[in-house]
Amino acid sequence: EAPEGKVRSQLTNEWIDEDLYDQRPLAVMYPINKEGMPQYGYDKIDIFYEILEEDGMSRQMAIMKDWKDLDKIGNIRSIRDYFVYAALEYDPIIVHFGGPVVYVKDILTRSDVQNINGVGGELGDSYDAFFRENPDGRASEHTAYTKSELLLKACDTAGFQLNYRDDVFADYKDKSHYQFTEASNKNTLEQYGDKAVPAESLDFSAAYPHDIPTFEYHADDHLYYRSIYGEPQKDGTTGTQLAFENVLVQWTYYEVRDDNGYLAFRMHDKTHDGMFITEGKMIHVTWEKDSDYGPTRYYDDNGDEITLNTGKTM
């Protein structure tokens, strides 16, 4: 039975306030650069992405539904078009600081895509939603931040709807983004027998050699704790380490676009491989996505959609 005034989040299946149910999330672009740490707003993350960009670096995107009470978010960095395609399935308000115009202009300036762009100009207005902080003399690209108050004013000025939009999201807004099990009934992956292999220490340095991301599973709270550069990745305000109930890995086709090293990833596809990691185990999956606003679906080797555990997903 639901606690009074609470409903299940479409993104995590956790209990949230009723007034958050229809609220559009933010999609916030965070850097991975060590010089840009610490970062702020992590505690509100529901779903977190890391995808490569040029020069072997990667970038992070946070999907956060409960975002209206944050005094500091960021630092904020530029976006790539494949992050936009990953974000659209949440009907978000996208928060970023520019991007390579030749590759992101077409998607960011589409009439259905709503973004708040710290650089302003042809990729979208800033709506005066950003500020600079630089107490330790870091490079300027690591000094741009925003906060909830400024974002709310920006949305009002821009005319961005704060609740899910019926014209693009009516088919999805009242459905769970993933298929979830209840928190009291964990999906241990034991039903897959030998196909579920142990996965308590995860090392993604081969895929992301710059920040060397790792995860350590803690059986006591069923969470995978994330580290980068050999240190816990923490929220700059609370000091809480990023941790996730579910880790999803997607493999996909990519190519190098030009001499600057800009990448392209195929974000709409069928039957590409991946991995689902939870409860200290891992199974092979395939994934598919066939529309901008439709969710990415993940299937086990029996062809059944996988069931995620209640909580945050990386």
In which residue ranges do the predicted regions lie?
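A surface/extracellular/periplasmic glyco- and lipid-processing/surface-interacting theme
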Residues: 2-49, 54-314
